[in-house]
């Protein structure tokens, strides 16, 4: 076990990116984005990085892509979600889990989303588990920020979930958000610059349509929202999620977030 101690614009009302001309002219380091399906895409997160001048370095270890030995030449790394489990025995799951040690040791920004969050939790010795009553969270659900999140303001009240497993909070981590639903732990921070969320801030309207249209069996699971609530929920809640994501990524990419 690794042991460490130590679809667009939520910019401004005018639609301008909050970046000075000189900052735009400076070359930015690429961001590693780890995806888990052949045709998956990073949604709003990928769009944000492109819009703000960060090249995308997309890796799919499941299909044989190597992960960088160091993040010296990257601004950080994001591991997104997927249909597999952090408890699966597949080699790429082991590779990704152990690789998270690179940003942790180098104190580079890391952001785990859904499966990515669960991989971080597993790396740090926490449990990733199925609900004892076989409940899932699929759709929009309420969350509540908790604890001192000094520079993570404007948390959304409702977020998009698509998972059947949850995680315990690792020892030494700071809880950032909880819920009263089937899986109470929704976000945590660890160490210098690692953040994990159980929900999907990257989800676009097109992805909501695609996920719900292609997986009707998932919507029949205990606790899942009906399809029309996914659509209505996205229209109602996605703008606030994008405001939060924009503010978060601006600070995250610069390694400026402090948790006090």
What are the roles of these predicted feature ranges?
Residues 124-206:
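Pocket-forming structural segment of enzyme catalytic cores
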């Amino acid at each position: 076990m690794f042991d460490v101690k130590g679809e667009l614009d939520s910019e401004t009302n005018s639609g301008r990116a909050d970046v000075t001309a000189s900052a735009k002219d400076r070359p930015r380091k690429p961001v590693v984005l780890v995806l888990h399906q052949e045709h998956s895409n990073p949604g709003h997160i990928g769009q944000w990085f492109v819009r703000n001048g960060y090249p995308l370095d997309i890796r799919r270890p499941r299909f044989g892509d190597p992960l960088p030995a160091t993040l010296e030449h990257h601004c950080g790394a994001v591991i997104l979600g997927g249909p597999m489990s952090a408890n699966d025995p597949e080699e790429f799951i082991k590779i990704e889990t152990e690789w998270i040690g690179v940003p942790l040791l180098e104190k580079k920004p890391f952001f785990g989303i859904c499966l990515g969050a669960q991989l971080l939790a597993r790396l740090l010795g926490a449990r990733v588990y199925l609900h004892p009553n076989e409940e899932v969270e699929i759709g929009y659900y309420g969350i509540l920020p908790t604890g001192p999140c000094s520079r993570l303001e404007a948390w959304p009240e409702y977020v998009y979930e698509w998972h059947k497993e949850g995680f315990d909070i690792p020892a030494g981590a700071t809880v950032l958000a909880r819920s009263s639903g089937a899986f109470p732990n929704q976000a945590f921070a660890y160490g210098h610059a690692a953040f994990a969320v159980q929900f999907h801030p990257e989800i676009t309207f097109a992805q909501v349509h695609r996920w719900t249209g292609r997986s009707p069996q998932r919507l029949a699971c205990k606790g899942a929202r009906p399809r029309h609530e996914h659509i209505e929920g996205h229209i109602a809640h996605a703008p606030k999620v994008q405001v939060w994501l924009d503010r978060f990524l601006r600070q995250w990419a610069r390694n400026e977030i402090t948790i006090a």
